[in-house]
Amino acid sequence: NIAVQYLVTGTADLDDVFRQNPDQFDVVISSAMDLQLKLTNDGFARQLPSITHPDWAQWRSSLFAFTTEPAAIALNTAAFDGLPTPRTRQDLIQVLRENPDQFIGKIGTYDVRQSGLGYLFATQDARTSETFWRLMEVMGSLDAKLYCCSGDMIDDLIAGQILVAYNVLGSYALGRADTQDTLTVILPSDFPTTMMRSALVSKSASSPDLAEAFVSHLIALQSDGAGGVFPLPPLVGAQDTSARASISLEPALMTYLDTLKRQTF
């Protein structure tokens, strides 16, 4: 019999905890692609040459992507009754600017100091378009609330504590039964940013063979399109960049992890 001990924490905390205790974990799964890539680059990941995976979805046979998921804008549906539903970031900027009294203190997004995924999304948004900084300026003027993770944002969105959640993971909102009539989830049509969730096996894993089998199982589930068994968005078709801006699994991701760049960002 095989037992799985599953530790859940934020992406930035996960990176810190694993770096300090690499022998305490067999598999590391995270949506923060840049942090995962740096762990691999720094020698924390075991090479698994027996796993066959597309070049664009793995790095050095040590880091393996197994889902893709776009960042979304989630809205409290009732709050937008009578207002145009924003389809782009510019649309959102316009709605917020024209209705400041309604949205002051009612916008949520990631705290990039706490969230590795939030920092990844923010840096990639900033690289893609100057619209991101205009949106951040508007959100800041409306006293946006900062969060560690998508789950907390969605909780407050459902409760009406916030009315807009920016860069939230859409599957988290759509996967909850209590959101169906409460939330509207939008993939921005201007440049929806898509991340790949990835897994690695610790070089110090106590059960490396079982860890490798687990990663192989994750990949197989997604490759087979077993959505009913594994409800996260599949990896298949991740490189169709015509409709969305996919974040590539490549060394350039580590650029914004430089201490000086992070401080200035």
Would you name each region that the model predicts?
Residues L39-I51, Q58-S61, G175-L187:
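Ligand-binding "clamshell"
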Residues D23-V28, R46-T77, G105-K106:
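A structural signal for short loop-to-beta-strand junctions that line the ligand-binding cleft
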Residues A72-A79, F121-T123, M195-S207, A226-V229:
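A bilobed periplasmic-binding-protein/Venus flytrap-type ligand-binding module shared by bacterial periplasmic
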Residues P54-Q58, E69, L135-G140, L146, ...:
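Periplasmic-binding protein-like
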